[in-house]
Amino acid sequence: TDVSVSAFALKVLRATRDPDVLQLGVAVPHSSLLPTRVLNGILARIARRDAGRGVSYDFPPGSPELRRQIARRALDAGCTLSPDDIVTTSGCQEALSLCLRAVTRPGDTVAIESPAFYGTLQTIEQMGLKAIEIPTCPRKGVSIEALKLALDRWKIKACLIVPNFSNPTGALMSDDNKRRLVQLCESRKVPLIEDDIYGELQHAGQRPLPAKA
């Protein structure tokens, strides 16, 4: 029996509710590793200060205050952004979906890392796109040489890459390989969609730069 990516993803997500299952299928740390009490205190203070804000809508492109803070934080990652450059979404999957919708049509081909996060495969399947899997090394990240060969062979409309701590390999691309990735996509006029969701997870020292930097 054929099993769709969406059906498989739903099965994995259902298992996340089982306390006896070690969650390796989703990128969610155990609650004991998070400063939950501190975060709850901050949320409570904000709710008391602006009680109506938490029960009202924020319309696109998102809260002006939040977008200003994101733009400021982006400076730490080597990116100069204006709040007007930023659109907030309800999660990473929505952001990736919006990016793909902006540069592809059903039937188009997208280059992705292999192995890839199942949610990415689910989004590509739901949008009627095709995926070309590019080999990824756990130490060096996506193979630039393999991506070049794929671009030579297929009409690829976008590249979706996670340069910093890719899921599920945890691979971190070097700054040199990030530059090569950007230069390759620019030379082929292929949009590069960078997913930097894990860029802040550096255990020590400065966070790695995104490819955009």
What are these regions (language model features)?
Residues 43-188, 193, 199-213:
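Conserved core of the PLP fold type I
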Residues 1-44, 68:
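N-terminal basic, amphipathic alpha-helical segments
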